[in-house]
C-alpha cells in the first residue's frame, strides 16, 4: 500500500527470477492485478498453443525474455537467481556454481541464439506479434558495452546497416567499449 500511495505511477513486474516453468503457474500470475507484466521462464516461449489461447488482456501482460543464455535443461535456475539476488543485496548465503554445459564460457550471444527458447526478430515479427504479444525483454544489462551493442544491433538495426553502425561505434575513439 505504501508504494501505491507514494508512487502511483510505479508498476510491478513478476520477474523471470520466479522461474515460472509451469503454464498453470504462469496463468495464475497473469491473473494477479498487481502485476503490469509477467515474465515467464524462457522455456515457455514456445508453448504457442497455450500462449495463443490466452485472452488478449493476459497477452498484453506477458513479457518474453528473448535472449536467455541459460541451458534449456537447467534445473538450478532458481538457486542461481537466489544467489545472485543475495549477492546484489550484500546478504550472506551459499554461492551458486553453475554446472550447465558451457557455463565456464560465460554468456555467449551465439549460444543464446541456438537456445530453443531464443526469440529473434523474425519470430517477433512473424509469430509473436500476429498472436497479439507485444512485450519483449532483452537480457544482459550488466554484461558489458560491447555485448549490449550486439544485442541492440541484432534487435534494433536492419541487417544491411549492422556493419556500418558497428564500425562507426567501434572506431569512435570517444567511446570506451572494451
Regions found by a protein language model. Give the residues of each.
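Active-site pocket-lining/capping segments in soluble small-molecule metabolic enzymes
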Residues: 1-25, 29, 35-178
Amino acid at each position: 500500500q505504501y508504494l501505491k500511495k507514494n508512487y502511483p505511477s510505479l508498476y510491478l513486474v513478476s520477474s523471470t527470477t520466479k522461474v515460472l516453468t509451469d503454464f498453470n503457474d504462469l496463468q495464475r500470475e497473469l491473473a494477479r492485478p498487481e502485476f503490469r507484466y509477467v515474465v515467464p521462464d524462457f522455456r515457455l516461449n514456445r508453448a504457442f498453443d497455450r500462449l495463443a489461447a490466452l485472452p488478449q488482456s493476459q497477452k498484453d501482460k506477458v513479457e518474453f525474455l528473448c535472449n536467455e543464455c541459460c541451458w534449456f535443461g537447467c534445473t538450478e535456475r532458481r538457486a542461481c537467481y537466489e544467489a545472485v539476488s543475495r549477492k546484489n543485496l550484500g546478504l550472506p548465503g551459499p554461492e551458486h556454481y553453475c554446472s550447465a554445459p558451457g557455463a565456464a564460457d560465460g554468456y555467449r550471444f551465439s549460444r543464446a541464439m541456438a537456445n530453443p527458447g531464443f526469440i529473434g526478430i523474425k519470430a517477433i515479427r512473424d509469430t509473436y506479434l500476429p498472436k497479439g504479444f507485444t512485450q519483449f525483454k532483452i537480457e544482459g544489462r550488466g554484461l558489458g558495452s560491447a555485448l549490449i551493442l550486439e544485442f541492440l544491433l541484432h534487435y534494433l538495426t536492419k541487417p544491411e546497416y549492422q556493419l556500418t553502425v558497428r564500425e562507426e561505434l567501434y572506431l569512435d575513439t570517444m567511446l570506451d567499449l572494451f
